[in-house]
Design a protein with these regions (language model features):
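Short N-terminal edge-element motif at the start of the domain
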Residues: 44, 51-96
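Structural signature of eukaryotic scaffold interfaces centered on beta-propeller domains
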Residues: 37-52, 94-102, 159-195, 236-240, ...
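Loop/turn-rich, solvent-exposed surfaces of beta-rich toroidal or solenoidal domains
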Residues: 50-55, 194-206, 221-291, 301
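Blade-level signature of beta-propeller repeat domains, shared across WD40, Kelch, NHL, RCC1
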Residues: 308-336
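Structural motif
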Residues: 63-71, 114-125, 204-215, 252-283, ...
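Residue-level signature of beta-propeller blades and closely related beta-rich strand-turn architectures
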Residues: 61-62, 105, 112, 121, ...
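Beta-strand-rich domains and repeat architectures in extracellular enzymes and scaffolds
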Residues: 1-67, 307
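Surface-exposed loop and turn segments in beta-propeller and other repeat-based domains
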Residues: 11-39, 78-91, 129-166, 222-230, ...
Length: 336
């Protein structure tokens, strides 16, 4: 049985001072990759999720190199790259814009193709060299990770395939305030299945839908359910109590934004914002919750870093993201 704790971590992370003009107004802590990964234009970080004591970050290659996962220990400030493979052992060529960890299962977004499921037991250690690689760049890769299965759930009643641009796993029994309004009877809070949240990146008239899918033991349970439309340029989604929190990017030189929708738990006071209290976001003061289909209004501008991507929460409920642009890349913990 493999474990992420068994993966050797030969590369070094570095703590960064928080620079809010780069890292966003909600930034609390920041870490940087090593110099090569900070500046490479071949590999671009995208998805993020916590897997117990390890942080996982996905990258895709702009030079047909496939995709990879960085296994990160932020306490020791070290990490390793683990190339992703198809079930046949070929490089997994996906954008990997979102990740979600589900008790040994890893879900990897594959845009129009759906999403892949991987399991930690399938990690294959490579004695320091990645399979099918002879380049110096990947000689320190200690393992490869083959995918098990591709899933492509569709939205009932929609002719347009859902694009799995990003994702995150919600807590057991989570539902949005709008879903609760539509339900009658007693709420169930069973620990399984888990809600998988997902959304579409879109600009220029492309759809920007948000959806949820129940997952159990790495398998979809039931249909994909629509949660409404989000703003253009979405890069990540996670929960905020009974609400949804999404990130949007603004190019390689401007900070991104966060958008909130949901119930009364989204209301904050001026004091919370002024003091920068943990669990708050800049510019949220006085804003009431909104249903998911009104997410496009009321952004909390410049709260997210330049090149903001996927969102996730750790076991303590803290908010995390990653920035993608060379020279400004960082793993970030945000207020929220």
């Amino acid at each position: 049985m493999s474990s992420l704790l068994d993966v050797p971590l030969p590369r070094r992370m570095h703590r960064l001072p928080v620079v809010r003009l780069v890292h966003g107004r909600a930034a609390e802590r920041a870490w940087s990759w090593d110099l090569r990964d900070q500046w490479t234009r071949e590999w671009w970080p995208q998805g993020i999720t916590w897997a117990g004591e390890r942080l996982l970050v996905s990258w895709y290659s702009r030079r047909d190199g496939g995709s990879r996962i960085s296994v990160v220990d932020l306490v020791a400030r070290c990490y390793a790259h683990v190339p992703l493979l198809t079930p046949d052992g070929e490089p997994l060529r996906v954008h990997a814009g979102g990740l979600a960890w589900d008790d040994g299962w890893l879900y990897v977004a594959a845009t129009a193709r759906g999403f892949w499921t991987l399991h930690v037991d399938d990690l294959a250690f490579t004695a320091g060299r990645a399979a099918r690689s002879t380049s110096d760049e990947r000689r320190r890769d200690p393992a490869t990770w083959p995918a098990r299965r591709l899933h492509r759930p569709t939205l009932p009643g929609s002719d347009d395939p859902f694009r799995w641009s990003f994702m995150d796993l919600a807590p057991p029994g989570w539902s949005s305030s709008e879903e609760r309004k539509r339900r009658s009877g007693v709420e169930t809070t069973t620990a399984s299945p888990r809600p998988l949240l997902a959304g579409e990146y879109g600009r220029g008239g492309k759809s920007t839908r948000l959806a949820r899918l129940e997952m159990s033991n790495g398998q979809p349970v039931g249909d994909l359910h629509a949660l409404g439309e989000g703003p253009a340029g979405m890069q990540g989604v996670t929960t905020y109590a009974d609400a949804l929190l999404v990130s949007t990017s603004a190019g390689p030189w401007r900070r991104g934004s966060l958008h909130l929708a949901g119930g009364p738990s989204t209301e904050l006071s001026e004091t919370d914002v002024d003091q920068g209290a943990p669990g708050t976001l800049p510019e949220l003061a006085g804003r009431a919750g909104r249903p998911a289909d009104e997410l496009a209004s009321g952004p909390f501008r410049r709260a997210a870093p330049i090149g903001v991507e996927d969102l996730t929460r750790d076991d303590l409920g803290r908010l995390w993201t990653v920035g993608e642009h060379p020279g400004r890349r960082a793993v970030l913990r945000l207020h929220g």
